[in-house]
Amino acid sequence: MNRYLLILVPILVLPACASLNSAITEGDSQVLVRQMQTRVYESLDKGDTLRSVLATLQDLGFVIDTADYEMATITATRLQEYELRVTVTVKDRNSHQLAVRANARVDDQLIDDPATYQDFFTVLDKAIFLTRHNVN
């Protein structure tokens, strides 16, 4: 009987260790995804930032689904070969910085390709520059 317990206990404990490591790895990857989805901008009004996000999404061929200025969230869709849906949220980071986070999905699958977010933020950087300098 004791022999069976010695065999059974490690068999029951090992899967628990594996799932814990998996959860830690998934948490780490979520942090990395969040980092590539977020860019911080200095000394710009939240309304101006939201207008720049709207312009950027439209320049990239997206149709705006919802724009909630109170919640500082914009959702847009681009239909080509597939449905690409983006939600962008703007929130205060501190008194002189705003964090812009873009979350892109294709058919309910999160896009975790850094190039996708880099392309979006490159265009947004230009739009914010133009807004900051009052260029239409």
Where does each model-flagged region fall?
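Positively charged n-region of N-terminal signal peptides that target proteins for export
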Residues: 1-4
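Ser/Thr-rich, low-complexity intrinsically disordered terminal regions
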Residues: 18-136
